[in-house]
């Protein structure tokens, strides 16, 4: 089984608690997680409960105490801004995780919440990306693929991603379609896209090229062993991408309330009931 990798500074600890909880909940053997963090945050991560192995490296020292707004106003050491430098830590993290012996790595932003087991990937898949599935005007700006949920199998791909960051139109994300083209040429059948049921973020619902009401109608109840019971067009939802703790972004809050409402319909499913109880401590009506 592949491993997981994530970045986590002080702002990500609350999200990590959800990520760890849901990885444990839906996977019989929770995967090893490789984490880039910083000295003040590492003890907080170590204190979080997780039955799998956590491998943490102090690699984010240049960004201690800084949020995105500040980093975007600060010149970077390699890229235009310090935030661009921070985003480029993702391919460096993947390179390091693969150096530790991981058999492929799935990068997850800390704010991924799983609703079922991790996706299965064939051994020939070298790169798997999650399309935003948003309207073209937003795709043109932010990129075809989301950089918060992606799989790669080799250091060569991680190095190519880092190289492409230098000319990306949107941080580490806008160049992912170029990475997909490169991988497709190098490995026949080596590139795969995750389906709509994976990495479903508020942006897929509110920024889609179809009305959000129509997209919501695709969601339904479909009880299946080992899954939460939420489905899109008869396929179980694997994960959503959201900050459950957020209080100052209406789009995210509306998405969270809607998802939690759907999950509450499924408390007859034991694991889903556990998830609802966990999330209800976080999300306030």
Predicted regions mapped to residue ranges:
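N-terminal anchoring/stem segment of glycosyltransferases
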Residues: 1-76, 99-101, 259, 267-285
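Short, solvent-exposed loop/turn segments at secondary-structure junctions
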Residues: 11-12, 40-41, 61-62, 112-114, ...
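Short, charged, surface-exposed secondary-structure boundary motifs
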Residues: 16-17, 21, 63-70, 136-145, ...
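Extracytoplasmic beta-rich repeat domains
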Residues: 82-83
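GT-A fold catalytic core of metal-dependent nucleotide-sugar glycosyltransferases
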Residues: 86-140, 144, 151, 155
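Residues that flank catalytic or metal-binding motifs in active/ligand-binding sites
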Residues: 108, 145-148, 172, 236
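Catalytic core and acceptor-binding pocket of nucleotide-sugar-dependent glycosyltransferases
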Residues: 155-255
